[in-house]
Design a protein with these regions (language model features):
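Rossmann-like AdoMet/SAM-dependent catalytic core
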Residues: 9-151
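Single conserved hydrophobic/aromatic residue that forms the stacking wall/gate
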Residues: 1-11
Length: 151
C-alpha cells in the first residue's frame, strides 16, 4: 500500500516466504544450512545430483531482512506465521460465510485454503514480515500472534 500526499510518502510492504528468525536460522542443529532441492514430490539437499531437473530453494533469515529494512528507513510492522496473518485478515470468517463445500471445485478450493493456513502445511512454514515507511498504522494482519520480538 503506497500513497502520496502533500507532506509525506507513506508506504507499507509485506514479505511472505519460508524461513526463520536468526536464532533458528543459525541453530547449531542446522549444520547443513537450509538449501533444499525438490523434484517429483521428493526433496534432497544435493543440487549437484540431477542438475537441471530440480527446483533449488533456501529458507530466508527474517532477522536479516528486518535489519536490512530498518537500515533502509523502514519500520517493522509485525512478524507472524502465514496462517495467523491470513486468519487475522479475515480468512476464517470468509470460510465460515461460504458454508459447506457442495461441489468438487468448492471442495478443492477449500482444501487449498486449508493448506495455506494449516500449521503442518504452509501456515507455519511460511512467515510474513510487514514494513512501513512514513506514518505508522495498525496492520490487521499482525493484530494477534505477532512474533516481532523473536527477530
Amino acid at each position: 500500500r503506497c500513497s502520496r500526499d502533500w507532506s509525506s510518502d507513506v508506504c507499507s510492504s509485506d514479505l511472505i516466504d519460508y524461513g526463520f528468525p536468526e536464532s533458528e536460522y543459525y541453530h547449531p542443529q542446522r549444520t547443513g544450512g537450509t538449501l533444499m532441492c525438490h523434484h517429483a514430490h521428493t526433496s534432497d539437499p544435493d543440487p549437484l545430483v540431477g542438475i537441471g531437473e530440480k527446483d533449488i530453494t533456501a529458507h530466508v533469515n527474517f532477522t536479516g531482512i528486518a535489519l536490512a529494512g530498518q537500515d533502509a528507513g523502514w519500520e517493522v510492522l509485525g512478524y507472524t506465521s502465514q496462517g495467523r496473518f491470513l486468519y487475522n485478515c479475515g480468512l476464517g470468517e470468509a470460510l465460515a460465510r461460504t458454508g459447506q463445500a457442495s461441489t468438487a471445485n468448492e471442495l478443492r478450493d477449500r482444501s487449498a485454503l486449508q493448506k495455506l493456513v494449516a500449521e503442518h502445511e504452509m501456515g507455519e512454514l511460511f512467515k510474513v514480515v510487514g514494513f512501513v515507511k512514513g506514518e505508522w498504522f495498525d496492520a490487521i494482519g499482525f493484530a494477534h500472534g505477532d512474533r516481532s520480538h523473536t527477530l
